[in-house]
Amino acid sequence: ALGAPLSGEALNSLVYEVEQLHHGTPSGIDNTVIVYQQPVYFVRGVPPETFHVGAPLTFLVIDSGVSASTRETVGDVRQLYTRDRAHYGAIIGEIGEIVRTARALIESGGALEELGALMSANHDLLRALSVSSAHLDRLCAAARDSGAYGAKLSGGGRGGSLIALVEPDLAPSVAAALRQAGAAQTWLMQLT
């Protein structure tokens, strides 16, 4: 009815439609996380699963200062996959396995070192899919070199944002190193 609040599912569907107008082929992750306001395990075509964090995690969210077209990046990945389904399908499969393992670690409050290593491995695989850029790679390296457990691009790639898993007391020095390496801004985020 007009004026009645929308269910989470209905709101998620509407926000996704808006994302389609803007991006062309959005993943559906952004709208899902925003609507449900908690960690979400997302697989396209499957109802999203929210989950709990076993122990607080501290991240730096990093603005690379570079904008890039998600539509173009997705199109380029699609072309790579079409040219060599076996090779790029294997990379996508590895990313899926990393995500499943990372979810289990997050839920159990698992080892930060292992979670950080998974983030960095995920970034490397995204680079192999042409989703990263030299600037994003430099920022990930700067985060790790200054004490982050791991770092990876987030979103459409080739620009935009990255995330780095850090100890709370190291966040200021990691943020400073990132700004020195060319990050436009950083924000501290606690996931609980």
Regions found by a protein language model. Give the residues of each.
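C-terminal nucleotide
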Residues: 2-6, 13-23, 31-152, 163-192
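Glycine-rich phosphate-binding loops that contact phosphosugars or nucleotide phosphates
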Residues: 159
